[in-house]
Amino acid sequence: MDRVLLRWISLFWLTAMVEGLQVTVPDKKKVAMLFQPTVLRCHFSTSSHQPAVVQWKFKSYCQDRMGESLGMSSTRAQSLSKRNLEWDPYLDCLDSRRTVRVVASKQGSTVTLGDFYRGREITIVHDADLQIGKLMWGDSGLYYCIITTPDDLEGKNEDSVELLVLGRTGLLADLLPSFAVEIMPEWVFVGLVLLGVFLFFVLVGICWCQCCPHSCCCYVRCPCCPDSCCCPQALYEAGKAAKAGYPPSVSGVPGPYSIPSVPLGGAPSSGMLMDKPHPPPLAPSDSTGGSHSVRKGYRIQADKERDSMKVLYYVEKELAQFDPARRMRGRYNNTISELSSLHEEDSNFRQSFHQMRSKQFPVSGDLESNPDYWSGVMGGSSGASRGPSAMEYNKEDRESFRHSQPRSKSEMLSRKNFATGVPAVSMDELAAFADSYGQRPRRADGNSHEARGGSRFERSESRAHSGFYQDDSLEEYYGQRSRSREPLTDADRGWAFSPARRRPAEDAHLPRLVSRTPGTAPKYDHSYLGSARERQARPEGASRGGSLETPSKRSAQLGPRSASYYAWSPPGTYKAGSSQDDQEDASDDALPPYSELELTRGPSYRGRDLPYHSNSEKKRKKEPAKKTNDFPTRMSLVV
């Protein structure tokens, strides 16, 4: 009986073991590489017909594996492992001392990831296998596979596997992970790229310096713009020539004064071109030729006391300050003509001709034979003692020196040719006119009184002309002048006379005729001829009393333009006044203005008044002479 009972108990136990839950993991420890995929396998068996719930948990190491690899494990852990051979100090510890996380869980076909592993390539495949896409450094640890069934509670429902994540050692890191170079190593390719970028920036810097007006490293030819270098190539060649000691050969450069429509002249002074008063040490080349000979360039004298680079820097500084427009302005604006230089020292233009004659002009003939003059101007400031003597300067050297000196504008202009036979007003004639105008000799006969009376009458007539402009409005007078483009005539200025000349006494009664138009012969005034005929027809007393209508007045009646064309001063026919009045009038008279415009006026605009003059002559001959003033005559004063 007892034997039968024992057999049934053993059979029941065997049946329970076969029908219970069993979970197994084929690999207890697995090693995987970093950033590589891996699969942790898990198998289970159950007698339940309902779907099981699969869950994977992660438990970190109890101790860091890094200390074990470096030999830094504690002595206590080693002693415990020796006592219990089945106990592992890295895996066997309480869950409170390490990190525990749910990796993933599967129920049916639904997979749910834990909070820490969301977003990663992790899933449960097959029945209970855990698949990880890319391993990370924190994935090393202990993974547990847990199977849960609702109607099978007996058996072993979990098992664990150790995962160790390792990295590659002994290999260089990948410089270009997503780019593969097959023809060369990656480090060679990266080095070539960096070198090319550096050379590109160097080329851009050279082109920027050479092609733009900045401080640059000169004499480096830029390949992108070789013709636009900012460095002075000519100055560089001049510096090399200065060091070598021979003149540089510069071809293709035109002359500095070969400008069309501009009169040729000498070279401007050094002060006109540059502000610096000290010129560089230049010496003229050996060129012995006339004014038409071609001169060579200048060569820089070698000086042992000065460094050659100082000369180069000086020339570069002077070229930087050079202004061609300033040179042209100074060439025409700084020249002073001979006529304007007469009044350079004294601003009073109404000075007498004796003071102007007192200034002696230099004579060119005296300078030709003056050795001190040529030794001073051609020898420089060093003096005649150090320079060559005056006899060494021949005629060709003097002519070359004259052509090299700057000339005034009036010397460069062409001279005007006056017609032959026209009396020119020279300084001697002006001086004689000043003597006769201001200081007339007094004679006791009647002719002197008549002359004084005539001159007084002309002055009163000129005052009457000036009074005409004073009585009328200035706007009307200047309006008439502004509408006329012709220059002022002698009558407009208020004076009509000619320089007095010494003539015989028998020709004193004849009129003095002056033609102020170049190129025309002197012409007689027909009004004076008519007045002479009238005096012959009148009785003697009337002729002695004198006609109050003088030729000067008739010339004023003819118009200002006709009076200026036939400008003359006849002998006076009226005796009045005293010596005191004559002295006062002579002292009040001022010299007329003088200009070159009187001689340069052509007969073109004066010839247009000739028909008007002829018509006025006909009217004057038809009308009888009338008294135009109330001056008392000599006969009316006789009691």
UniProtKB/Swiss-Prot annotation:
One of its GO terms (biological process) is regulation of RNA splicing. SMART domains: IG. The keyword Ion transport does not apply. Residues 21-162 form the Ig-like V-type domain. Residues 393-414, 442-464, 483-493, 606-617 have a biased composition (Basic and acidic residues). SUPFAM superfamilies: Immunoglobulin. It comes from the Eukaryota. Residues 273-295, 374-415, 437-639 are annotated as: Disordered. Keywords: Cell junction, Disulfide bond, Endoplasmic reticulum, Immunoglobulin domain, Membrane, Methylation, Nucleus, Phosphoprotein, Signal, Tight junction, Transmembrane, Transmembrane helix. Residues 208-639 are cytoplasmic. May be involved in ER stress pathways with effects on lipid homeostasis and insulin secretion. With ILDR1 and LSR, involved in the maintain of the epithelial barrier function through the recruitment of MARVELD2/tricellulin to tricellular tight junctions. Also functions as a B7-like protein family member expressed on immune cells and inflamed tissue and with T-cell inhibitory activity. In the inner ear, may regulate alternative pre-mRNA splicing via binding to TRA2A, TRA2B and SRSF1. InterPro entries: Ig-like_dom_sf (IPR036179), Ig-like_domain-LISCH7 (IPR051874), Ig-like_fold (IPR013783), Ig_sub (IPR003599), LISCH7 (IPR008664). It is found in: Endoplasmic reticulum membrane; Cell junction, Tight junction; Nucleus. Belongs to the immunoglobulin superfamily. LISCH7 family. Expressed in testis, brain, pituitary, colon, heart, nerves, prostate, esophagus, lung liver and small intestine. Highly expressed in macrophages, also expressed in monocytes and at low levels in NK and NKT cells (at protein level). The modification Phosphoserine is found at residues 473, 579. Interacts with MARVELD2 and OCLN. Interacts with P4HB AND HSPA5; the interaction with HSPA5 stabilizes ILDR2 expression. Interacts (via C-terminus) with TRA2A, TRA2B and SRSF1. The gene is ILDR2. GO terms for cellular component: bicellular tight junction; endoplasmic reticulum membrane; membrane; nucleus; tight junction. The keyword Secreted does not apply. This is Immunoglobulin-like domain-containing receptor 2.
